[in-house]
Amino acid sequence: MDALVEDDICILNHEKAHKRDTVTPVSIYSGDESVASHFALVTAYEDIKKRLKDSEKENSLLKKRIRFLEEKLIARFDEETSSVGREQVNKAYHAYREVCIDRDNLKSKLDKMNKDNSESLKVLNEQLQSKEVELLQPRTEVETQQVMRNLNPPSSNWEVEKLSCDLKIHGLEQELELMRKECSDLKIELQKAKQTDPYQEDNLKSRDLQKLSISSDNMQHAYWELKREMSNLHLVTQVQAELLRKLKTSTAIKKACAPVGCSEDLGRDSTKLHLMNFTATYTRHPPVSPNGKALCHTASSPLPGDVKVLSEKAILQSWTDNERSIPNDGTCFQEHSSYGRNSLEDNSWVFPSPPKSSETAFGETKTKTLPLPNLPPLHYLDQHNQNCLYKN
């Protein structure tokens, strides 16, 4: 618009210059033509000048309106931007504040939970320690009971073993009776054969001798089985009585003696018993002190249990001494060398195995009849079994 205003000014100034020039015009044209052209130019100039003024007014109005609109638009834009920014800032601030509050709450809850967990863990540890201490006592009691049970088996096992041994002894006694009956029947048949037919006497003698040798072998085997069972039963009862006596004495002097030494003596004595197929061996050693030396006991009066044990040992020894040798067709059967000695002083019993057929001449044919061995009476075996049961 300034350029247009300047153009208008230039036009007006140019018009003024033309007016100055037209003061003293030189009449080129003549007469009416010059006047008409001059009048047309003046009217055109006036018209153009009026248009320029109108356009300048419109221009100024438009400029004002544009400035007003620009200011209005800028104010509106500032208001919009300021309101949006404030709202966003407010929202962000509120969100940050809420997050901070949540963080503080969670932190306080976490601290509280950690504190509760530490306290509960401490309480649980104390309870666990107390329970472990409570469990240690019954565990030690159970272990001691197991050790005592291993050292001293229950009486029910001994009773079962004794019953089984009694049944075996009864069966062997019945077999022995049957063998005796067969032997007597064979003797009767032999006498009848001698009276009836002297020609067949030799054949019958050989057959009878073979039968008698077999029957005597079976009878002797049954006798030695019975003897072995009796000796094993006697030895088991003796060891049990000794163990019970030691337990009684150990409980009586429990405060004066250490329990470890007593248990070791019982374990050592219980391990010295060996029951085998044909022999039974028991060896007792003197107790060992904690220093490794054998303890010396002063002479004292024997207990009632010892008197019973010695009396039964004397009975069994006399019985075995009477049965040391079994005559068989003129030959004597020699037992084990350690069987005849006095074994009550050194506390060791060794029973020999039954004789074999190769050691004695059972299969030889002889003209003489075989005498029966001197077997112990049955009432003595019953009495010995009763004594063992009473002792147990």
From Swiss-Prot:
Q: Where is this region: Homodimerization?
A: 1-197
Major location, coarse class? cytoplasm
- From the UniProt entry, list the residue stretches annotated as the region Interaction with TBK1 and IKBKE: 216-257
Kindly provide the PTM information from the record: Ubiquitinated via 'Lys-48'-linked polyubiquitination by TRIM38, leading to its degradation.
Q: Where in the cell is it found?
A: Cytoplasm
Q: Which GO terms describe its cellular component?
A: cytoplasm
Residues found modified as Phosphoserine: 318, 353
Which residues lie in coiled coils?
A: 40-76, 102-135, 166-196
| InterPro entries per the UniProt record, alphabetical | TBD (IPR024581), TBK1-IKBKE_adapters (IPR051891)
Q: Superkingdom of this entry's organism?
A: Eukaryota
Give the UniProt keywords, A-Z.
Coiled coil, Cytoplasm, Phosphoprotein, Ubl conjugation
Q: Where is this region: Disordered?
A: 345-365
What does it do? Adapter protein which binds TBK1 and IKBKE playing a role in antiviral innate immunity. Activates serine/threonine-protein kinase TBK1 and facilitates its oligomerization. Enhances the phosphorylation of NF-kappa-B p65 subunit RELA by TBK1. Promotes TBK1-induced as well as TNF-alpha or PMA-induced activation of NF-kappa-B. Participates in IFNB promoter activation via TICAM1.
Q: Quaternary structure per UniProt?
A: Homodimer. Interacts with IKBKE, TBK1 and TICAM1. Interacts with TAX1BP1. Interacts with CALCOCO2.
The protein's name is 5-azacytidine-induced protein 2
Annotated source species: Pongo abelii
